[in-house]
Every structure is written in C-alpha cells, then in structure tokens.
Amino acid sequence: RLDKDTSGLIVIAKHGYAAAVLSKSIEKEYTAVCEGVLKGEGTIDVPIRLKEGYTIQREVAKDGQRAVTHWKVVGGTNHHTLLQIRLETGRTHQIRVHFSHIGHPLAGDDMYGGRLNGIGRQALCCSKVLFVHPVTGHRIELACPPQDDMMALVQ
C-alpha cells in the first residue's frame, strides 16, 4: 500500500494465498526529497499515533506505536536533500511524520509542513520492492527511478 500521491511501485496479488505470503515477506525502499540539508545517514525511532480529532493525520506521541525509519543521503542541493529510506516498521504516513518531526518535512507535503514549491504532491516514491515469489520461492527485485518532478528539486 502507498499513501495517496506517493509514486512508485506496488505489488498486487491475484489470490488470497499469494497476498498472505507477500504481506509477510515484502521489503520496500523509498526515495524522498526533504526540505533543508541533511548529511550522512541516520535512524528515526519515535512512536506514531493517529492525531486526536483527525481521521487520517498522524503525529509523534509517546503513547503511539513503535515506528523506525532508516535513511541515507544520496544527493541534494542547498535547499533539498535526496534520501534513500528503508522502514523497519510500516505505520501510516511514517516517513512523512518522521521527517516533519526532525524539522525536514518532505517537499510538497502540506499535511506535515512541506512547502508546495515546484511539486504538487509529497516528494515520495516507492523505488524498490523485494519479495519471495509465493509459488516459485525465487527472490524478486523490482525497481523504478524517482519521477521527474522529484528529481527537478535536487538538480
């Protein structure tokens, strides 16, 4: 599953058995553009919960569910940073909430503090999916490049 306006890869199972197997073995990597300049790599380990009074928006809170995001800088400019991201947990809006929490919201993510300059959606792409084929047992790796609207922010 991907958030609305997140681009990239999705895997659709044709049968319930395949869906059950895939849900336990699928790994995803994301590419994102955040505002500001980050260096190196890091881990964000703060819990997330549904924001009180909202039906979809999330927030960082001590009583939330554990959420862990690993990130690495792969490029950028003086205004934006291009990131490669791997989730240890898979909470709704996890990447968006975590980067907003550390003061670097995703570009275009107006729900979590990002500015809409140059992009009309959050700058987030599911760029790699890895899974074990439910019938053959072969490891499958799918990849796609980030979309042009995202890359324009870091060139």
Give short role names for the model-derived ranges.
Residues 1-155:
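RNA pseudouridine synthases
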